[in-house]
């Protein structure tokens, strides 16, 4: 008897699965995936980033990975600090997860206009998109739609360290963006000949782990095969964490040398 192989989960399937207990996120995620404007913006953002500028992935795959990172990070952080919308008494943890999902998924769509100030262009482009998606999520609550939209726009505006995130959710979106730093993302520009400290250091990042912390609420481990990965950690991830004043006290950050790598460093180095 031939054993049938289990179908391989796609990245999209994995992201959808993490929202199985949150109906708000399920609705929003399906709306995002089936929205022609959203998908075209992601496609064209990637075209700007990779084809025209020689940058790493800023399209659909990046959006999915950042959404997954953000949701996982928020889950662990909520054990030590409540999301701002919960602290302020205007929403629930499910609402906070929705803010993080939409902020993470849409944060780079302004790249279709320009890399410079893309956070501002994203806010301009996605405001009407958010309006129609949130009408589906909260069909009978206009006030809630407007309130949640404001949270999402703040998170997107602050994701690139140009502005300080004043909510937990906004800080999570920025950090989740930086967590997509593994060599898989850097491989395309690297193979196209865009070799610089950014792409070379990213090629040294094997894996990123988000887990329950020992001394702080969350522990982030960046697994490296080469010491050059330290640049990626300090210039991108550490800056994003330090830019989120409400979260830095809850995150411990470690650079960890992979077992097969040359031991220029000790097995792990605490960064934060």
What positions do the PLM features span?
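Divalent metal-dependent phosphate-bond-processing catalytic cores, especially two-metal-ion Mg2+/Mn2+ enzymes
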Residues: 1-33, 54-57, 68-94, 106, ...
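Short alpha-helical hairpin
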Residues: 27-50
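Short amphipathic alpha-helical segments, especially helix-boundary/capping motifs
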Residues: 40-48, 98-103, 146-147, 152, ...
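Glycine-/proline-rich flexible loop or hinge segments
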Residues: 45-58, 103-110
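His-Asp-centered metal-binding catalytic motifs of divalent-metal-dependent phosphohydrolases/nucleases
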Residues: 66, 90-126, 151-159
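Membrane-interface starts of transmembrane alpha-helices
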Residues: 93, 141-149
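Inter-helical turn/loop segments and adjacent helix faces that build the functional surface
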Residues: 131-144, 163
């Amino acid at each position: 008897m031939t054993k049938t192989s289990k179908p391989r989960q796609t990245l999209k399937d994995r992201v959808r699965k993490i929202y199985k207990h949150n109906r708000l996120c399920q609705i929003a995620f399906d709306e995002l995936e089936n929205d022609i404007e959203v998908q075209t913006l992601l496609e064209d953002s990637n075209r700007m980033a990779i084809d025209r500028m020689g940058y790493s992935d800023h399209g659909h795959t990046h959006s999915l990975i950042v959404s997954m990172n953000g949701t996982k990070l928020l889950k662990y952080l909520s054990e030590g600090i409540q999301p701002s919308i919960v602290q302020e008494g205007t929403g629930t943890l499910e609402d906070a997860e929705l803010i993080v999902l939409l902020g993470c998924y849409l944060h780079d769509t302004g790249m279709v206009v320009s890399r410079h100030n893309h956070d501002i262009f994203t806010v301009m482009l996605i405001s009407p998109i958010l309006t129609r998606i949130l009408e589906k999520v909260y069909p009978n609550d206009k006030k809630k739609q407007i309130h949640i939209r404001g949270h999402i726009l703040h998170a997107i505006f602050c994701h690139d360290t140009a502005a300080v995130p004043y909510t937990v959710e906004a800080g999570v979106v920025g950090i989740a963006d930086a967590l997509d730093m593994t060599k898989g993302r850097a491989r395309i520009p690297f193979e196209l000949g865009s070799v610089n400290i950014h792409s070379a250091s990213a090629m040294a990042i094997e894996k990123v782990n988000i887990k329950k912390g020992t001394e702080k609420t969350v522990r982030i481990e960046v697994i490296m095969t080469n010491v050059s990965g330290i640049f990626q950690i300090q210039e991108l991830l550490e800056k994003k964490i330090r830019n989120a004043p409400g979260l830095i006290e809850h995150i411990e950050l470690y650079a960890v040398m992979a077992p097969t790598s040359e031991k220029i460093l000790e097995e792990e180095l605490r960064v934060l």
